[in-house]
């Protein structure tokens, strides 16, 4: 067990990589020397963490509160993660969203973490805080605010301007995190400074980290410590090279962790598993890098992101599906991982332009919990089986990982077996998989192992074990089932539980058609079958041996006080392990000392308590569902589900049982095509009398950007405070009659588009691709211009978000906007440029919805995307029925009321389609979807792939009025028509989830200075 002890750091003198002044070595050493016995609630040894003195496997899921901007729904997600058997959540905070205006960190409304911490505590979830300042996370600029991109210093270096820029945010978030630490009764147990800080340009792996890099990490750590953070720090080294591990000096963290994505990201070919990142020796690398801390994987692939022109997140869910979870996650357990975080477990939404340019609105990520908070993906259930097994297997946490060798223990070279040997216990674990982990074939084998009754070859009663397709299995020997010894089991363990009167219930499972076998000591009574049939049983030496073939039929055996359930894997999916509340300070947090109930209960069970001799359950059902209490620590005489008493019966084996009746509710949703839509021209800039007097003049003759501009002034959007959504440029000149073409090189990120006009004449569009971040092109002018007459180019650019970056590359600074331009017959200085983005730029108008929610379009600048704008004077026109007859931008708005039944969780989404016969529905066009002011969809008709845009309750008012607006940007001369737009519901779920308080929805009011 290790406490946060004093660190004595030898600081070697070395030159800085960057020229700007660096932070003082002395101040960083002083900070390290003050880290003596900061707390004793979270400690560790080489095997695992201890929380309040109890050894815990930390099984964590990644969930970002900023991607679900309805605080009232955070508890729902936490409960679904708790029900997986997880006990922790890792979360990022996004500096770019919280300090979009320099010096003003927004921490109220949807940006407040108070409810996040409260909900985590109530759900029994410990938190791993990851405030950055750089987070990556497929966010625009990796979470770095746009104004920071203007700095001269290299981002993530020890440059004085960069470090000082982080101070206000890190001090603010540090104090918020400190207040929520376990030492203050909160849920935060670990904190991670920076993120994947493992490379630097022109620095080799052996030379990294340099003194400069160490200073950057140490500075972030000091910021957190100065703010009062005392819980252990942890690093996520995506190189697995020991960077910043304990004992490495300046910048070292308390715990060493890695992150890895071995399945990679090809969602278009999800059945092709890559092999070059599959880990085989992590137990050795960890022992070399950090032998005194538990093996921690701070990020491991739980899905994948998809990009513009991709295949949708469903392909990503297939890439990292239940089979991958069985094979690749179990491979990690073979290395003895003690802290395991799955990225993502709930992804959410890149609403309000918060994502980077490589992703679209959905951040579903193919995660175990879908974007609309559903848990129907099979990998949710597979993760539940694994997490619950590890939770009741304390011997795993102290076991010593062995080496996986093909043919060992089986004599079959097509099988790889990785042993974990009991360390202070008699329990051994054997992880079995195909030698070629990508294999989809079937192979038969026998397992020869040593047990307390001697060496045995399993199965003993004839036949063979099998691996069918992509699979991996945990076999155990001498496994402790609460004072009963399970001599061996080829079937996997879901869980075991303590019942009343010293009863123990063990749940084993396997795949359909598999043959399995387990053995019990012969001093127990001969096992008897009390439910099911077709079980073979014999005494072998000093053991009872039981064999069966897995079918959908449940089999239950009893041997004295031990009850064993033999299940088909898909039946095990329907079982839930719920920890009963305990006294403070444990309360709802997971603890090996707590009592549990085991219930078969369908779609979701959330919580349990025993009150007044009744078992009170909360949960969700999507069909009429039988409940059966498989195990409980005491007897009771009734079941209450979501507050309703159920008629109880007894099952065949005497368990208390009941049925939850499901009745689909009546749901009435508006037909968006039939609504009264109001229309506004949102590109008045191309009208002959438009004045851009209030626009930003682009007169900067310098830039700190590493890409130097070529004209007389810089045209980069970030240099003028515009960082997302969309951009509009206006280039003024006087004609001389020699104009025949204009050259424009524009940048908007992958998937971007642009449209260009000369006065009122449409010159064409770049409609975008899934590859181009920039696009240079010559555009022919359609007619001879009149000498001496003023003209103006209007250029609309879609801003898809900034890039992410590897440390030191400054890739996130790559400019958006116009990079280069030329006009035939003119010097470039003849054009005078103005531009706009969102109204106010960094002094953005809507602090409620954040700095990136709005773009440059006229309706957005005026705030008409917000509820209750002055639409009475707008003409009636529908994006679905009418659309646009030429290139341009239209803005459409409507309102409707919803009155959905309470007691049901009813996921809603807006679905775009091309069902219209009008040819304009097949043109290149782009839409933004605003729901009560929140931008919850960017739809690209000709590129895709996203057509379905979930919007959560709390953004949509399920019992009230909703304001919906759609911007329609037609990129082709024939115009555009939204071929179809529907509000659709998924299967309603009878649910115990709490109806959320709506997110703040301030409405329209006149904006000072709007143009």
From Swiss-Prot:
Substrate binds at residues 92, 136-138, 195, 261, 365. Disulfide bonds join 267-316. Its main location: secreted. Residues 1-19 form the signal peptide. Glycans are attached at residues 202, 406, 423, 455, 588, 622, 704, 745, 759, 772, 778, 913. The keyword Disulfide bond applies. Belongs to the glycosyl hydrolase 35 family. This is Probable beta-galactosidase E. It comes from Neosartorya fischeri (strain ATCC 1020 / DSM 3700 / CBS 544.65 / FGSC A1164 / JCM 1740 / NRRL 181 / WB 181).
